[in-house]
C-alpha cells in the first residue's frame, strides 16, 4: 500500500498503486480489478485521482507514438508530461495551445480535468484541441472516440475526471 495525495498534499489516502508500462500490462490490471481510478502525475487538487482500492498511475505509459510536423498533431500515450511535449516540440516551432498552471500534468490528466490556462477566455480549454481519444472502458474494450465517432463518450471523457475509463 502506498500513501497518495493530490497536489494540495491533503488528504493522504492509502491505496494499492499499480503503474503499467504497456497496453498489455494495463489490460491485465483492468481485467483483474473491479474498483480503480486512473491517475496521471498527481497534480489535481484534493483526492480526485485516488481510489482506496486501486489507483492506476499512468506515468510509465509516456511515449510519443506519432507526430505530424505539418499540422502539429501529436498522438501520444496518456502518461506523457506536458513538459516533455514542450521540451520536444518547442524547438520545432510548436507549443500546446493550452497549458495548465504546471507543466508537470500528464496528457491524460489534462484531458480528464479539461485544464485551462491564462488564455481560456480566448482559446478555451485543453479539450478544444483534442481530436480523438482511445478509452479502456468498463468492458475492457478499447474504444476510439472523437467529436464525430462515439461522441457522447468523447464529451463525457473530456473533463470526466477518469470516470469513463482509462485514457
Predicted feature residues:
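N-terminal regions that are enriched for targeting/export leaders
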Residues: 2-6
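Glycine-rich N-terminal segment of FAD-binding domains in flavoprotein oxidoreductases
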Residues: 8-101, 113-119
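A short, structural micro-pattern
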Residues: 50, 58, 99, 105, ...
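Short, acidic, Ser/Thr-enriched surface-loop or helix-capping motifs
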Residues: 69, 106, 137
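FAD-binding subdomain of flavoenzyme oxidoreductases
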Residues: 110-167
Amino acid at each position: 500500500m502506498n500513501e497518495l495525495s493530490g497536489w494540495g498534499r491533503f488528504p493522504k489516502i492509502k491505496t494499492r498503486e499499480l503503474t503499467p508500462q504497456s497496453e498489455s500490462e494495463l489490460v491485465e490490471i483492468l481485467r483483474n480489478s473491479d474498483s480503480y481510478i486512473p491517475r496521471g502525475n498527481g497534480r489535481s487538487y484534493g483526492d480526485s485521482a485516488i481510489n482506496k482500492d486501486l489507483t492506476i498511475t499512468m506515468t510509465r505509459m509516456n511515449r510519443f507514438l506519432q507526430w505530424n510536423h505539418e499540422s502539429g498533431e501529436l498522438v501520444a500515450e496518456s502518461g506523457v508530461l506536458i513538459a516533455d511535449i514542450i521540451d520536444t516540440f518547442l524547438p520545432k516551432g510548436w507549443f500546446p495551445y493550452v497549458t495548465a498552471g504546471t507543466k508537470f500534468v500528464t496528457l491524460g490528466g489534462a484531458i480528464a480535468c479539461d485544464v485551462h490556462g491564462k488564455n481560456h477566455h480566448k482559446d478555451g480549454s485543453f479539450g478544444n484541441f483534442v481530436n480523438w481519444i482511445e478509452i479502456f472502458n468498463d468492458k475492457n474494450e478499447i474504444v476510439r472516440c472523437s467529436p464525430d465517432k462515439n461522441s457522447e463518450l468523447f464529451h463525457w471523457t473530456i473533463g470526466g475526471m477518469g470516470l469513463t475509463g482509462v485514457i
